Amino acid sequence: MKNIHCINHPLIEHKLGILRAKETKPFQFRMLIDEISSFLLFEASKDFSLKEIEISTPIQKTTVKKLDEKIMICPILRAALGMLESVFKMIPDASVGFLGFVRNEETLKADFYFQKLPKDAKKRTAIVIDPMFATGGTAIDACNFLKSQGVKKIKFISILAAPQGLKKFSQMHDDVEVFVACIDEGLNEKGYIIPGLGDAGDRVFNTL
């Protein structure tokens, strides 16, 4: 699966270990999500195009580079809201396109209930963020929707992923690069990633 990138780094592994622990407090959990998301965004943005502009330093004029792509961050509600701030810190001029999915506990599928994209969404590079990439169903539906709206370039960032979900996603969207911090063992009978870290949304918002 050439479109799947698992980012290996000692600091990511260290932070993941704390993130997984059930004793980790909500404020720590949010901080770790933010930090790991920054690592992943750094990798996902390596091929962003640049343009040269002229500026004046306090000493003289010079040519510098700046992003030449319009970026749209697409958090999948609600857990991905914990990742949003880290992306904003690195790309403050990005627009946000919200995608709302709710998990059906009986079918283990996600129902699409809300979307709000920028008017110029099809002109932007979409960075979809969701901390957990489990069955792949939500990711597939999110990318299906974005493509239906004319979005040409999509990247996906997740903290943890299950191999089953990644394989299923790659069969449907091999043109979408996925960046994850860790690929776990798999899924349990309820469709949760194992060993995982529990329900990311509940841990971010302290609603356990």
Swiss-Prot record:
Activity modulation comment: Allosterically activated by GTP.
GO biological process, one term: uracil salvage
Keywords: Allosteric enzyme, Glycosyltransferase, GTP-binding, Magnesium, Nucleotide-binding, Transferase
CDD domains on file: PRTases_typeI
Catalytic activity: UMP + diphosphate = 5-phospho-alpha-D-ribose 1-diphosphate + uracil
Enzyme class: transferase
Co-factor remark: Binds 1 Mg(2+) ion per subunit. The magnesium is bound as Mg-PRPP.
GO terms of molecular function: GTP binding; magnesium ion binding; uracil phosphoribosyltransferase activity
Record: residues binding uracil: I193, G198, D199, A200
Name of the featured protein: Uracil phosphoribosyltransferase
Species assigned in the record: Campylobacter jejuni subsp. jejuni serotype O:2 (strain ATCC 700819 / NCTC 11168)
Gene: upp
